[in-house]
Amino acid sequence: MGRNIQGPSMIRVPDWVENPLGDYYLYFADHRGEYIRMAYADEVTGPWTVYSPGTLKLEDSFFPTSCPPCSLAPGRTAALYAHIASPDVHVREDLGQIVMYVHGRDVGQQFTRLAISTDGINFEGR
């Protein structure tokens, strides 16, 4: 699952989601992760079940999947790595969407990208 888990973001699953896995979805990631993880529960206090195989994958996020190109930072000496992490998830009731902001590396810098879902599991990177 990873050694550097961070960036948890929890939502109450909207009523318009068909066949939800639970009443709450908790999104998180390993900072060197290749996908955003998700756990679900019917109560905020759990028990939580980790959804496998995860939700948004690095290759679907529009971030590079290998370095370079993400290691092109001028003067950079530390190793860089392709990743997707730090999900920040919001329910857009007005649009019937679940919106996820994530960060990753591209051309040597950290960037934030957006992904959209109607079910909280299958996200489309933008």
What kind of feature is each model-predicted range?
Residues 1-85, 90-126:
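Beta-rich carbohydrate-recognition and catalytic domains
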